[in-house]
Amino acid sequence: MTIPAFGLGTFRLKDDVVIASVKTALELGYRAVDTAQIYDNEAAVGQAIAESGVPRNELYITTKIWIENLSKDKLIPSLKESLKKLRTDYVDLTLIHWPSPGDAVSVEEFMQALLEAKKQGLTREIGISNFTIPLMEKAIAAVGADHIATNQIELSPYLQNRKVVDWAKAHGIHITSYMTLAYGKALKDEVIARIAVKHNATPVQVILAWAMGEGYSVIPSSTRRENLASNLLAQDLHLDAEDKNAIAALDCNDRLVSPEGLAPAWD
C-alpha cells in the first residue's frame, strides 16, 4: 500500500471547524486525512468521517503517537484510544510524532512497540516524524527499513531538507512534507508568483505541485471550501525543469518548527 501523494492536514483545527473541513474535503474527493493525538481533534475527525458516508476502505487515515505515550506499556493502549475516537478498527498509518526528548524512551523500545501494533492489525503501516539521520538509523536498526513507510518532516521551498531527503530515499523511506507552504510565507515569494502566472495557477498550487513532483506526499489544511478545491488541483499541475531549478534556489534552511525541549539536533 502506498501513501497517497495528497491528503488533508488537520493541525490546529478543532471541534466544529475540523468537522466542517474534513466533511467538505471528503465531499470534494479527498481520501487521505492526517491527524495526531496531540491535535486533540481525533474524535471530531472520526465524527466527520462517519457523517460523510465515505466507505472506510476508500480512506487513508494517519495518526501520530504523542511523546507521553511512547513507552511500550503506553503506546498500544494509546493507539487503541485513538481508534475509538476515530471510530475505526484500524488506521492506515501510525507515526511516532516526535522522537523521545532526551532519549527518555529508546528508539528501539517505541519502534518495536509500534511494530507490535502493526502485527496486531491496529495500523496497516508505521512510520516516523521529525526524525534526523541518526534517529532514522536507529529506527531502521530497531525494525528494519521495510517497516518504515515514511518520515514526515517540515519541508518547504525555504527548507528543502536535502540531506535528510537524500538519506531517506537511499534507504527506501518515503518523505511526507508538512508546513509545505512555510506558514504562508512562501506564497508571497516573487519566484513562486512568476511560476504561478506562467502556469495560470495559484502560488499554493505551484508549491504543492513542486513538492509532489519531488516525490513527496503533502497534507495541506484549509477551512475554506474554495481553497480545499483549489489545493486539490495542484495534482494536475506539472512544473518544468526551469521552474524546479528556480524553486531549488530558494532553499535557505529557514526552519519554522523547532519546539524547545522537543526538537532533536537537526541535520
UniProtKB/Swiss-Prot annotation:
GO molecular function, one term: methylglyoxal reductase (NADPH) (acetol producing) activity
PROSITE patterns: ALDOKETO_REDUCTASE_1, ALDOKETO_REDUCTASE_2
Residues noted as binding NADP(+) in the record, renumbered to the chain: 179-231
Subcellular location: Cytoplasm
GO cellular component, as recorded: cytoplasm
Pfam families named in the record: Aldo_ket_red (PF00248)
UniProt keywords, alphabetically: Cytoplasm, NADP, Oxidoreductase
Annotated active site: Y39
Keyword hit for Oxidoreductase: yes
CDD domains registered for this protein in UniProt: AKR_AKR3F2 (cd19139)
Reactions that this protein is recorded to catalyse: hydroxyacetone + NADP(+) = methylglyoxal + NADPH + H(+)
Enzyme class per UniProt: oxidoreductase
The family this protein is said to belong to: Belongs to the aldo/keto reductase family.
Job description of the protein: Aldo-keto reductase that significantly contributes to cellular methylglyoxal detoxification by catalyzing the NADPH-dependent conversion of methylglyoxal to acetol.
Quaternary structure and interacting proteins, as annotated: Monomer.
Name by which UniProt lists this protein: Methylglyoxal reductase DkgB
Organism encoding this protein: Salmonella typhi
